[in-house]
């Protein structure tokens, strides 16, 4: 029988790269991993906390289509401030943290980076190491599966039909230069008592080809009917 494997781990070292870059002695390796986990959790919690403070961004619904509108004057968003990945590079006296984000309006706010650095220093107790945080804006946000998953989650929490949310997510990928996409949602869809899975696929998706650059994410969505699981595969290109 065929066994399923994580598409990112399957391609690690070929089309996917590590998100942490550092060396450590074997006895200190676990401490380094725990420190990376604390850094990533602290950044995500900071984004989540500031998003909940209030937002003027709207997701406008029309009878024919739904459009996400981003107000640049606002500090946070409902489904736009999504971190795609966090890269950590450690040197002897410096920790470099690179945050890749779709729409970095929140972190461009005056004093936001300084506040985040203080929170991180308290979390990891970095006394002898200097912390350096930089922000990288994702050039094509809608080719990132994390952003699409967050969009679907926002739609489902607002009682939008799951099929409509999936189709709209597929439509958003037309703005990006990709060759294939697959969206799968599992759980009590539509409030039904029996859990099931629905899937929509468009274009090519060569999961068995290692040289094919495929981005993937698995995202849980908490609804009033229970937890739904969203999986998104995006075939970017072939190397």
From Swiss-Prot:
Keywords in alphabetical order: Chloroplast, Plastid, Ribonucleoprotein, Ribosomal protein, RNA-binding, rRNA-binding
Location(s), subcellular: Plastid, Chloroplast
Region (Disordered), start-end ranges: 50-80
GO terms classed as biological process: translation
InterPro entries named in the record: KH_dom-like_a/b, KH_sf_prok-type, Ribosomal_S3_C_sf, Ribosomal_uS3_bac-typ, Ribosomal_uS3_C, Ribosomal_uS3_CS
Domain KH type-2: 43-139
Top-level taxon in the UniProt lineage: Eukaryota
Gene Ontology MF term list: rRNA binding; structural constituent of ribosome
Pfam family, one: Ribosomal_S3_C
GO cellular component, one term: cytosolic small ribosomal subunit
Subunit structure: Part of the 30S ribosomal subunit.
PANTHER family: 30S/40S RIBOSOMAL PROTEIN S3, SMALL RIBOSOMAL SUBUNIT PROTEIN US3C
NCBIfam families listed in its UniProt record: rpsC_bact
Family that this chain belongs to: Belongs to the universal ribosomal protein uS3 family.
Protein name: Small ribosomal subunit protein uS3c
